[in-house]
Amino acid sequence: MKQNIKTILLIFAIALGFTFHNFFSQFSKFSPMLLFLMLFFSFCSVDFKNIRFRKEYLLLLIYQVGVSILVYLLVRQYNEILAQGVMLCILAPTAVAAIVMSSMLGANVASVTSYSLLINLVISIVAPIYFSIMDVPDIVPFWLSVKRIILKIFPLLIVPMILVLSIKIVSKKLSFHLKKITILSFYIWIVSATILMGTTMNFMLKQGSGNYLIIILLIVSAFVLCIFQFLFGYYYGKRYKDERACAQYLGQKNTILAIWMAQTFLHPLSALAPAAYVLWQNFVNSFQLWKKK
């Protein structure tokens, strides 16, 4: 399929979810299943022998873990809610959709898979520590927070990987046929993006009342961080000839997890930042697909 058609489909999905957000938000319960299928078909084309941890991950880990808390401590001097939202936009781990996007862009899918597994594990431990020092009404015990986050992340990441590995071992013929239809992951992603866009818009409209200055700052901050993280990842990745993959490491965020963490552990309004990030990262991905055509 030509890249310009992919770009048009993604933009159409964003517009459709935005316009008919009330309708598509009703299907949010199907998002985990869609993400599971999306990863399953993406993993069918991955050579798991190439999944390994690389030295270039270290600086990216330091950025996400270190800069996120540093920015939080600086911004909280102005406003706690804004600080939490900004921190989530940096701390949020790589989205599973980054694996699909990487394959569309011709990036190193195994590399993105490796970093995604690593950063999701790290964040599941680090995030509860950070949440414990924040100004929140109800502090959830550390190990309970870790358990909740791990249960939210890893079934979607690990189970499809184990399933694909099992198929590769048991039936090479089935594995070969599945590899030929990995394009299905893109179509599933389009459906998932439409639902996510609708759910996000619905959430933003419901939360979007009260302190309008903070709301605007959350949305603008998400835009600035989205552009910065894609660019930082891209130019950092050039050192290792892996720029498209590195851009996905940092730029494509697991916003579903970030929104859930905000609503579960932090001030609910801070979730507007990762919610807005959904919109911006989809526009960036549309631009990347268009540029690659």
Question: What kind of feature is each model-predicted range?
Answer:
Residues 1-293:
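Alpha-helical transmembrane segments of multi-pass small-molecule/ion transporters
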